[in-house]
A protein has these predicted regions:
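Active-site-adjacent "lid/gating" segments in soluble enzymes
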Residues: 1-130, 138
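Aromatic-enriched alpha-helical interface/lid elements that frame and gate functional surfaces
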Residues: 114-179
Length: 179
């Protein structure tokens, strides 16, 4: 009645670790800046973190199976499958298949809404993100750009209350918010 979780690198039994899986999935090519072709790796071992959570869930499911049937179970989880599942859940696989194109690198911009980094007066960098309506209003008020943002929205014929529209116009908006 043993309940066990076995974490392997790849589904075929070959070795893989978080950083090699990250490269194989292609995320280092998706990060970075559009004008710089170098891949940028992520320092957060995301696949390891997700794999741990999935392993814990698998262990709970196997334990429940044992309590209901009296039989043990072996849950095998491949790190590469975790990464592929995550890429699928985030829409990256379907987007590439449907649009027949790769999502371009967007640097430090936040995908799908407005967010980017700015250099401060003392040469440091700060990340600014405005997703909610309150955050969006606050950013405009803090930078004193409400009239300019309204004028830009009118010129582009968009509604910046929609965060997707803010994402599409992020370069023009960033120019307004620059100190």
């Amino acid at each position: 009645d043993l309940v066990m979780v076995s974490i392997i690198g790849s589904h075929d039994g070959t070795t893989a670790v978080d950083y090699t899986v990250n490269c194989a999935i292609g995320y280092p090519n998706a990060t970075g800046y559009p004008d710089d072709p170098r891949p940028v790796n992520n320092v957060v071992p995301a696949w390891d973190l997700m794999c741990g959570q999935m392993a814990a869930l698998g262990l709970l499911a196997a334990d429940r199976y044992r309590s209901q049937t009296g039989h043990g179970d072996l849950v095998t989880l491949a790190l590469t499958d975790v990464a592929l599942a995550a890429a699928g859940m985030l829409g990256g696989i379907a987007e590439a298949q449907i649009n027949q194109t790769e999502r371009p690198s967007i640097g430090n911009d936040l995908y799908g809404a407005y967010g980017t980094d700015f250099v401060t007066g003392d040469g440091r960098r700060v990340m600014v993100v405005a997703i909610s309506p309150k955050q969006w209003r606050g950013l405009q008020e803090a930078t004193g750009t409400t009239p300019q943002v309204q004028e830009l929205a009118s010129t582009l014929r968009v509604d910046f209350s929609d965060e997707g529209e803010r994402f599409l116009a992020r370069d023009k908006l960033t120019q307004l918010f620059l100190p």
